[in-house]
UniProtKB/Swiss-Prot annotation:
It catalyses: L-ascorbate + H2O2 = L-dehydroascorbate + 2 H2O. Binds 1 heme b (iron(II)-protoporphyrin IX) group. This is L-ascorbate peroxidase 2, cytosolic. GO terms for biological process: cellular response to oxidative stress; hydrogen peroxide catabolic process; response to reactive oxygen species. Its cofactor is heme b. It comes from Oryza sativa subsp. japonica (Rice). Inhibited by p-chloromercuriphenylsulfonic acid (CMPSA). GO terms for molecular function: heme binding; L-ascorbate peroxidase activity; metal ion binding; peroxidase activity. Optimum pH is 6-7.
Length: 251
């Protein structure tokens, strides 16, 4: 990854970011929607394609066309929940706002503090469908999407997978049902402790989760994060930051 050169934003813009943060904390507490907000931020950013420099965290998820992509089922709910806050803060880009929602979602559920740099500009065109990871696939597919397409590392893949500590799968959205951990509203390393301890009645393991244990490069990272939550939090914050800034502020 090249070094970053962040744009300068006005004091008024920074004040709007602060206000958005407070309002997002309130919304997420009231609606228990941290998992949904993290998914919105991830799915917005995870469309980035290194070779064509298209897609990425640039606010296109507000477009109903992108919300209708199969991988984004249910994200129309996130957009709708966020609209009343966004309406109060017209100066903010959707791009910054959706990524800020993901950062706040991790913070308020007890996860690490992910740095946030404002200044993303909204792009008009949504990316083509089919760039997000498919949960039914294995490690080759994960590397194709995260490494070849997005430019992230093996460590980023495993750390970001740990974000599944939040939330659950819904049959009507993904075809899968259930939560990964026994407390889906707390951000901790239990995704990894569950993976290492094997399958349990009532908890979900997707094919893409099992792939982490089967892969010789991924598995040591899973075991490290299961044993050391601080190491997971440090690597997660770095990976989330990278994901949230794909295609943004690059030299």
């Amino acid at each position: 990854m090249g070094s970053k050169s962040y744009p300068t934003v006005s004091d008024e813009y920074l004040a709007a970011v602060g206000k958005a943060k407070r309002k997002l904390r309130g919304l997420i507490a009231e609606k228990n929607c941290a998992p949904l907000m993290l998914r919105l931020a991830w799915h917005s950013a995870g469309t980035f394609d290194v070779s064509s420099r298209t897609g990425g965290p640039f606010g296109t998820m507000k477009n109903p066309g992108e919300q209708s992509h199969a991988a984004n089922a249910g994200l129309d709910i996130a957009v709708r929940l966020l609209d009343p806050i966004k309406d109060q803060l017209p100066i903010l880009s959707y791009a910054d706002f959706y990524q800020l929602a993901g950062v706040v979602a991790v913070e308020v559920t007890g996860g690490p503090e992910v740095p946030f740099h404002p200044g993303r500009q909204d792009k008009p065109e949504p990316p083509p469908e089919g760039r997000l990871p498919d949960a039914t696939q294995g490690s080759d597919h994960l590397r194709q999407v995260f490494s070849a397409q997005m430019g992230l590392s093996d460590k980023d893949i495993v750390a970001l997978s740990g974000g599944h500590t939040l939330g659950r799968c819904h049959k009507e959205r993904s075809g899968f049902e259930g939560a990964w951990t026994s407390n889906p509203l707390i951000f901790d390393n239990s995704y990894f402790t569950e993976l290492v301890s094997g399958e349990k009645e009532g908890l979900l393991q997707l094919p893409s989760d099992k792939a982490l244990m089967a892969d010789p490069a991924f598995r040591p990272l899973v075991e490290k994060y299961a044993a050391d939550e601080d190491a997971f939090f440090a690597d997660y914050a770095e990976a989330h930051l990278k994901l949230s800034e794909l295609g943004f502020a690059e030299e």
